[in-house]
């Protein structure tokens, strides 16, 4: 056992004394059992995490029953919805790296034999995922689960995205104060991750197809008995993984990354999943070509349209068969998934999901009746985005296949929001928000406020937005993010000028500005070098080390320092 490093031999007597002092060692025999870390993320200010202390207690009890000794520790968490639209959002993506580093530190410092990860919301799941692959200790994930969908006084289904769009409608005068306050009180009725196919739920669903979590991890409600049963079952499965020495890198292969993107396409997941899955590939040492994502989109049908792209919530998906039913449906067509891969159950992806079928074909469509023959996400390339940009095509009105408009440029999120609110942005514009990438932001903040304001003002089909920042999973409309290289890295998005004609072509997956190469070269020669916005603290260190979105926005030490 790994943990023998801290508990065996006369040299470790001081360590054993300290271990006895924790209260977790109940008898001398416990020193012969596997030490299991519970990497929790309980925090009071994040509704998706307020109940995780209870779930960790269930996991600890089950681990003891299964013959292990549990030790719980906690990571930080940022609520993207609360941090939205101010400096707090600049800490959101960087928090992923802190979580990964913190988990790595505790796991490796104490030589745990296995790790039970309990994440839920946006950056916590991917942060723990990076730690799991980096430490490569037998591990399992069981998230906290989604919240119930809200319900307005008029009976309208609500999610957090409804609330963000309501802000624009209220400012526009098309929503009364009474209805606005009613929505505010009822949009988030329980604990759990937000009820739509936003980043948290997207990532927790992907954990199932990656093979690191049990079926229904992504959809069983936070408040359900099923969630608690899933925690218990996951604990017993983890102990089996420890005995069999099955590690995350045995499960996270290039084929697993492919399958994660395929499920993402089938469910129209958040664009943030692209960022996090590329970061996972990087951490696992997997060379992953971005063009592979479009190849997967070409062969993967869009089967389940979930809020904000429809009124269906994660609970609706769960009762319709959940992720297992979607996986089983995709397995019916040869070549979409790699169903014979190893998973944390010790069985294959096929074995885990073959028994589940679609229970409601309105919520989860069949292969014979997809929303689209192609996936809900696309990578775009062109002279604005030589290294790519991403759009959630499932959140774009199907009538829009191309959009050409005049650029209106902003060097910050706040300037763009002000221009949208004061009606400077008008139909036919392509809003360009730059210097908001990983380095430029810093922290690649989400552009949910401007996209929600555009949709809330009724301009969702008449105004497009492109950015080197990113979007919330709650974003919909003609919105291209993750443009790489970012402006702070002298990317071409920095060269666009007001009035330039920009074309977004969803059919050919291109993003171009109608400016000659010679003119772009001249503009680049005049471009001033980027100066870091933050000079001290964590964000200053992050700015110095972070890469653009095409590599997952990971932190890398310059080669000359290695």
From Swiss-Prot:
The EC code for this enzyme is 4.2.1.9
**Requisite cofactors:** [2Fe-2S] cluster; Mg(2+)
Q: Which residues bind Mg(2+)?
A: 80, 122-123, 446
Q: What does the cofactor section's free text say about binding?
A: Binds 1 [2Fe-2S] cluster per subunit. This cluster acts as a Lewis acid cofactor.
Name a Pfam family for this protein. Answer: ILVD_EDD_N
Which positions are catalytic residues?
Answer: 472
State any GO CC term.
cytosol
In terms of Gene3D superfamilies, this protein maps to: IlvD/EDD C-terminal domain-like
**Pathway assignment:** Amino-acid biosynthesis; L-isoleucine biosynthesis; L-isoleucine from 2-oxobutanoate: step 3/4; Amino-acid biosynthesis; L-valine biosynthesis; L-valine from pyruvate: step 3/4
Gene Ontology MF, one:
2 iron, 2 sulfur cluster binding
Reaction(s) catalysed by this chain, per the record, are: (2R)-2,3-dihydroxy-3-methylbutanoate = 3-methyl-2-oxobutanoate + H2O; (2R,3R)-2,3-dihydroxy-3-methylpentanoate = (S)-3-methyl-2-oxopentanoate + H2O
Q: Does the keyword Transferase apply?
A: no
List-wise, which residues carry N6-carboxylysine? 123
Which InterPro entries does the UniProt entry name for this protein? Dihydro-acid_dehy_C (IPR042096), DihydroxyA_deHydtase (IPR004404), DiOHA_6PGluconate_deHydtase_CS (IPR020558), ILV_EDD_C (IPR056740), ILV_EDD_N (IPR000581), IlvD/EDD_N (IPR037237)
Q: Ubl conjugation among the record's keywords?
A: no
One GO biological-process annotation of the entry reads: L-valine biosynthetic process
- SUPFAM superfamilies in the record: IlvD/EDD N-terminal domain-like, LeuD/IlvD-like
Which parts of the sequence bind [2Fe-2S] cluster? 121, 194
What assembly does the database describe for this protein?
Homodimer.
Family (UniProt): Belongs to the IlvD/Edd family.
Q: What is this protein called?
A: Dihydroxy-acid dehydratase
Tell me which species this is from.
Macrococcus caseolyticus (strain JCSC5402) (Macrococcoides caseolyticum)
| Gene name, Swiss-Prot/TrEMBL | ilvD
């Amino acid at each position: 056992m790994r943990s023998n490093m801290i508990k065996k031999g006369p040299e470790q007597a001081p360590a054993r004394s300290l271990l006895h002092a924790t209260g977790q060692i109940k008898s001398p025999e416990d020193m012969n059992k596997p030490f299991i870390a519970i990497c929790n993320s309980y925090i009071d200010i994040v509704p998706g995490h307020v109940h995780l202390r209870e779930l960790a207690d269930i996991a600890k009890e089950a681990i003891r029953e299964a013959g292990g000794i549990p030790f719980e520790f906690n990571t930080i968490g940022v609520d993207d919805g609360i941090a939205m639209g101010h400096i707090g959002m600049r800490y959101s993506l960087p928090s992923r790296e802190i979580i990964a580093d913190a988990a790595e530190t505790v796991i490796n410092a104490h030589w745990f034999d296995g790790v039970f990860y309990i994440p839920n919301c946006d950056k916590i799941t991917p942060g723990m995922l990076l730690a799991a692959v980096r430490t490569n200790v037998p591990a399992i994930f069981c998230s906290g689960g989604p919240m119930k969908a809200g319900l307005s006084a008029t009976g309208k289904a609500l999610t957090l995205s409804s609330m963000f769009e309501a802000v624009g409608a209220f400012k526009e005068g098309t929503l009364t104060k009474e209805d606005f306050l009613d929505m505010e009180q009822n949009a988030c009725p329980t604990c759990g991750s937000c009820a739509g196919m936003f980043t948290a739920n997207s990532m927790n669903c992907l954990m199932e197809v990656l093979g690191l979590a049990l079926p229904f991890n992504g959809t069983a409600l936070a408040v359900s008995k099923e969630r608690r049963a899933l925690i218990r079952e996951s604990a017993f499965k983890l102990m089996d993984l420890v005995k069999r020495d099955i590690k995350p890198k045995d499960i996270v292969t290039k084929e697993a990354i492919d399958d994660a993107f395929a499920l993402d396409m089938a469910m129209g997941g958040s664009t943030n999943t692209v960022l996090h899955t590329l970061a996972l590939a990087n951490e696992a040492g997997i060379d992953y070509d971005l063009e592979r994502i479009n190849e997967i989109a070409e062969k993967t049908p869009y089967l389940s349209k979930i809020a904000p792209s429809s009124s269906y919530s994660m609970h609706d998906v769960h009762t319709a068969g959940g992720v297992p039913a979607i996986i089983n449906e995709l397995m019916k067509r040869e070549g979409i998934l790699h169903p014979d891969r190893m998973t944390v159950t010790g069985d294959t992806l096929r074995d885990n999901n073959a028994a589940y079928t679609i229970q409601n074909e309105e919520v989860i469509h069949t292969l014979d009746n997809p929303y689209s023959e192609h996936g809900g996400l696309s990578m775009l390339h062109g002279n604005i985005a030589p290294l790519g940009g991403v759009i959630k095509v499932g959140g774009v009105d199907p009538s829009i296949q191309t959009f050409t408009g005049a650029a209106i440029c902003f060097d910050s999120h706040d300037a763009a929001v002000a221009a949208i609110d004061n009606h400077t942005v008008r139909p036919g514009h392509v809003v360009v928000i730059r210097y908001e990438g990983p380095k430029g932001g810093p922290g690649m903040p989400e552009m949910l406020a401007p996209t929600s304001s555009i949709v809330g003002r009724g301009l969702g089909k008449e105004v497009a937005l492109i950015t080197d920042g990113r979007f919330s999973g709650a974003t919909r409309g003609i919105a291209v993010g993750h443009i790489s290289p970012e402006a702070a890295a002298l990317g071409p998005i920095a060269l666009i000028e007001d009035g330039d004609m920009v074309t977004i072509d969803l059919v050919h997956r291109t993003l171009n500005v109608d400016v000659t190469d010679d003119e772009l070269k001249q503009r680049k020669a005049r471009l001033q070098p980027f100066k870091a916005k933050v000079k001290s603290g964590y964000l200053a260190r992050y700015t110095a080390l972070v890469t653009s979105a095409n590599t997952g926005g990971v932190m890398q030490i310059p080669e000359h320092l290695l």
